[in-house]
Amino acid sequence: MKQYKAYLIDLDGTMYMGTDEIDGAKQFIDYLNVKGIPHLYVTNNSTKTPEQVTEKLREMHIDAKPEEVVTSALATADYISEQSPGASVYMLGGSGLNTALTEAGLVIKNDEHVDYVVIGLDEQVTYEKLAIATLGVRNGATFISTNPDVSIPKERGFLPGNGAITSVVSVSTGVSPQFIGKPEPIIMVKALEILGLDKSEVAMVGDLYDTDIMSGINVGMDTIHVQTGVSTLEDVQNKNVPPTYSFKDLNEAIAELEK
């Protein structure tokens, strides 16, 4: 197995499933830290701030720092502020998205007369929120969605994801959003900029082919699939472009790296 200078690592299905740590996750991060290999946690979860993500990882005894976390909310805020500094935004989403947009100098409004409509996972979504978002897009606001995941793994099973919520506005308006998170290149390019490395020097680690693995493939990066979440070994082997590597878990990845 190739030795990479850095790793981009998914969270849900790779580091943990819901509130349960996945076997090998802590060991993999400990291995990278001992070797002095930088890594970033890249997640489509827009509801949490980097500090909240870090706290969850630390509760599982997985080493993490806020500056090592790249959320779809952060990538979304950066994308908008680079295009339109100080723009007005109507958003659906949690505290992670609200904080990211505000700290990027964007103005959050509660009506449809805005420059951007941004959809992130909102566990308190209502018809009125969707109505305002729909009117905003119809009024000409640029339509952004943090990530396309139509379902998310939870302890109860697979629940509606942000892609499902986004589809309500998209179907109603006939407008397709610009997605920011995996598998889109935008969040991956942002992560590479933070690392200061070329895509050939970095590998993407994740469980879900359609988001994690495709995000690496879409930017020309090597990919490491772990069979600890959604996509099985059979799933990824049957794809037109399979991952560079597929392991039972991250313990198996460590064993390969140590050869």
From Swiss-Prot:
Concerning Gene3D superfamilies, the annotation shows: HAD superfamily/HAD-like (3.40.50.1000)
User: What cofactor is needed?
Assistant: Mg(2+)
- The enzyme's main class, written as a single word, is hydrolase
Q: EC number(s) in its UniProt entry?
A: 3.1.3.-
Domain of life where this protein originates? Bacteria
Give me the Gene Ontology terms describing cellular component.
cytoplasm
User: Keyword annotations for this protein?
Assistant: Hydrolase, Magnesium, Metal-binding
Q: Which GO terms describe its molecular function?
A: metal ion binding; phosphatase activity
Q: Which InterPro entries does the entry mention?
A: HAD-like_sf, HAD-SF_hydro_IIA, HAD-SF_hydro_IIA_hyp1, HAD_sf
Keyword check for Transport, yes or no: no
Family matches, as Pfam families = Hydrolase_6 (PF13344), Hydrolase_like (PF13242)
Its function, per the record, reads:
Catalyzes the dephosphorylation of 2-6 carbon acid sugars in vitro.
User: What family does the Swiss-Prot or TrEMBL record give for this protein?
Assistant: Belongs to the HAD-like hydrolase superfamily. NagD family.
Q: What name goes with this protein?
A: Acid sugar phosphatase
What organism does the record attribute this protein to? Staphylococcus aureus (strain MRSA252)
